[in-house]
């Protein structure tokens, strides 16, 4: 049998591995971080300025920010092919008491979107970025061919707004306002929970949606299962991004589906990935729910045809991955893996190890081990 793990992950600086190839370059990460800081600064001063200019006489609070999604989970992969982009989610929060000063929630949602977009315009024009305003739950700023920043807008309970920690890094259409005011009869703040985080939505006004529990859940899974679990999630995303140039199963779906399937395999990322991939099709077909909100189906979002498409893709992937680990030729194994992951998988058959069946079995732990510390210095 073959041990392909050195080509998936290594801690040796002078050897390449797919895990490192999935990272954005240091220059790209620095550019994104700098752009995010500039966007935050722009919104921090710009939203209060725009609102005051449009008649809000009361003291307008500065928004707070909370990074969510793959940048926060350390599962962000560089794009695999055009037109993919690295997606950085940076939530923008205002306190509920301020947002609910408007008579109707729909008005408040529209005002929040419009104020943020108006505030961002000078920065976007100066940097020659692109402002995308047709996403229902966020404002998107395309900052480079390889990356964009998504800014979802939230109303948060006042006491949580006060305690929300600041991150360590740092078309105003009146027609649509009129439309919003005239929308739904149920358009009253009393219909919305005052103790929940609400996400502004361009069509649905506000939705109960708090990104923080998902982040806490995933980081808790990594703490319990070790860094190998985080790497396996990144490999699943890498396969998806090579298989589907757009679409495919969402990252949160892959994370939630993989978590109960994962078993730590000592220094064998290839086998840890194979364990998950082998069980993934049945798990997808059986339905996967949000791990922090069981009433929310993640597979439903993908649709029945999308779920079946993904399940079949992972069935084929499992055959290839199992065939590669059982192959007699390291060169053939590398060719097969590059077919599944693209050129980011190293074509270095001389680093593939031939191992016995007994050694492969020994890589599986009898019991769950402690949190893995090796590799935490590397970007993940």
From Swiss-Prot:
Induction: Part of a CBASS operon consisting of capV-cdnA-cap2-cap3. One of its GO terms (molecular function) is ATP binding. Its EC number is 2.7.7.-. Mg(2+) binds at residues 87, 89, 150. ATP binds at residues 140, 209. There is a cross-link at residue 380 (Glycyl lysine isopeptide (Gly-Lys) (interchain with K-? in acceptor proteins)). Keywords: Antiviral defense, ATP-binding, GTP-binding, Isopeptide bond, Magnesium, Metal-binding, Nucleotide metabolism, Nucleotide-binding, Nucleotidyltransferase, Transferase. GTP binds at residues 68-73, 237, 251. In bacteria expressing capV-cGAS-cap2-cap3, this protein is conjugated to about 130 cellular proteins by Cap2; more conjugated protein is found in the absence of Cap3. Primed for activation by Cap2 which conjugates it to cellular proteins. Disruption phenotype: Deletion of the capV-cdnA-cap2-cap3 operon (plus neighboring gene Q024_03603) results in about 10(4) higher titer of phage PaMx41 in this strain. GO terms for biological process: defense response to virus; nucleotide metabolic process. It catalyses: GTP + ATP = 3',3'-cGAMP + 2 diphosphate. Forms a Cap2-CdnA complex. A Cap2 dimer is bound on either side by a CdnA monomer. Cyclic nucleotide synthase (second messenger synthase) of a CBASS antivirus system. CBASS (cyclic oligonucleotide-based antiphage signaling system) provides immunity against bacteriophages. The CD-NTase protein (CdnA, this protein) synthesizes cyclic nucleotides in response to infection; these serve as specific second messenger signals. The signals activate a diverse range of effectors, leading to bacterial cell death and thus abortive phage infection. A type II-A(GA) CBASS system. Catalyzes the synthesis of 3',3'-cyclic GMP-AMP (cGAMP), a second messenger in cell signal transduction, from GTP and ATP in response to phage infection. Its product controls the activity of cGAMP-activated phospholipase CapV, a phospholipase that is a direct cGAMP receptor encoded in the same operon. Belongs to the CD-NTase family. A01 subfamily. This is Cyclic GMP-AMP synthase.
């Amino acid at each position: 049998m073959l041990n392909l793990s050195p080509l998936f992950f290594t801690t040796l600086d002078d050897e390449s591995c797919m895990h490192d190839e999935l990272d954005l370059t240091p220059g790209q990460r620095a550019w994104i971080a700098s752009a995010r800081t500039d966007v935050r600064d722009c919104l921090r001063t710009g939203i209060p300025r725009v609102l005051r200019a449009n008649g809000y006489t009361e003291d307008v609070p500065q928004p707070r920010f909370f990074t969510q999604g793959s940048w926060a989970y350390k599962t962000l992969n560089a794009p695999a092919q055009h037109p993919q982009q690295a997606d950085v989610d940076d939530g923008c929060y205002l306190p509920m008491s301020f947002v609910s000063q408007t008579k109707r929630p729909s008005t408040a949602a529209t005002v929040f979107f419009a104020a943020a977009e108006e505030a961002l315009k000078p920065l976007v024009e100066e940097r020659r970025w692109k402002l995308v305003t047709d996403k229902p739950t966020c404002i998107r700023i395309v900052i480079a061919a390889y990356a964009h920043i998504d800014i979802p807008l939230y109303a948060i309970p006042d006491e949580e707004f006060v305690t929300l920690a600041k991150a360590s890094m740092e078309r105003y259409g009146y027609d649509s306002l009129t439309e919003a005011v005239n929308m739904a009869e149920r358009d009253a703040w009393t219909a919305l929970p005052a103790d929940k985080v609400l996400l502004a939505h361009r069509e649905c006004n506000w939705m109960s949606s708090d990104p923080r529990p998902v982040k806490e859940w995933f980081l808790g899974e990594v703490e319990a299962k070790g860094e190998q679990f985080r790497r396996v999630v990144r490999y699943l995303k890498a396969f998806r991004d090579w298989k589907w140039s757009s679409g495919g199963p969402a990252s949160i779906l892959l994370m939630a589906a993989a978590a109960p399937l994962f078993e730590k395999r000592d220094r064998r990322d290839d086998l840890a990935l194979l364990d998950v991939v082998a069980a993934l099709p049945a798990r997808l077909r059986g339905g996967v729910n949000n791990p922090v909100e069981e009433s929310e189906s993640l597979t439903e979002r993908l649709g029945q045809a999308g779920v079946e498409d993904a399940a079949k893709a992972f069935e084929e992937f499992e055959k290839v991955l199992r065939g590669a680990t059982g192959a007699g030729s390291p060169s053939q194994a590398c060719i097969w893996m590059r077919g599944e992951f693209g050129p980011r998988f190293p074509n270095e058959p001389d680093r593939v190890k031939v191992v016995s069946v007994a050694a492969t079995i020994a890589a599986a732990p009898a019991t769950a081990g402690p949190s893995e510390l090796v590799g935490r210095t590397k970007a993940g």
